[in-house]
Every structure is written in structure tokens, then in C-alpha cells.
Amino acid sequence: ELVKLLFTYGDREIDIDGTDENNNPIIYKIIVASFIIDDLKNDDLLFKDETHRIIFEIYDKALDDGILPKQQFFVSHENAKIAELAANLLSSPYKLDNWEKKEIKVKTEEDVLSKLVITSVLRFKDMVLDEKRNELTKQIMETENIDDQIILMVKKKRLDDLRIKINHELGIV
């Protein structure tokens, strides 16, 4: 989902709620690619899939250079896996009919882009945390040393607390 958002809306601006230096609520604008890349880098999160990781690195470098790649760059990329992924993610088999004639407003991805981007980043983080929790659980079961088990359980508790926070933000109980 994050790669699709980068391909489709990477160069678009979204509004993000934040606070200023006096802790007053503000809304600031940020480029979608910048929000996704910076947020994942800030938490030292990487994609497991090599193709996704390469795309992440391309966007990271492009942000440093100040020039974001266009969709065509990925569709015609020399790496066949990137080109295929781009073509698949950018082609949608669905098209909304013109509901305005019937006075029915249908929300598109663009209408809820800020929320979609934030939710997708949080879901990715939740998925990564879940994988790390599962690894720690396995290590706890395999470790015979009680002191090592306690250290692993403390790490798992921190991950559990992070997951609870993320799930709260996602509205998941």
C-alpha cells in the first residue's frame, strides 16, 4: 500500500495535524513521499521485500536531490520487477461512474489522502511490530537462561506497548 501511495501520490501535498513550539495545534503541509520516507527512516523501518526496498531508496535519494520521479520512471524502469510492480499498482480495474448526475458524492482516495497516508504508515508499522513480537516470542521459548528470557520479555513488553498505541491511533481495540 505504501509503494502504491508513493507511485500514485508521492508528489502531492497533504495536511498533517501537529503542534507548534508552544504546543498549539497547527496544520502543516508535507509532500506524501516525504512524510512516508521520513517517518519510516525516523523509526529505522525498512521493507523486507527487496523491490520495495529499492523503490524506498529511489524516493529517499530523490527527496535529497529535490526531484521526485514520475510514474513513467518506474513503469519503464530497467529493473523488471520494479517495472512490473509499478504497472500493476498504477493500473486500476475500477472506475467510478459519474454519480454527480444522481447527486451522490463518492469519496475518492484523493479526498481522504491525508488519512489514507497516515493510516497506511501506521498499518505498516503495526505489521513490522507484529513480526518483531513473534520473533521475540520464539526467542523467549527457545532461551533457557532466565536472565535472557527476562531481557527478551522486557523488549516484547515495549513492542506490545507500541502496538497498543498504534492500534489506538488506528481505532483498533
Residue positions per predicted region:
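Amphipathic alpha-helical segments at domain termini/boundaries
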Residues: I67-K125, D130
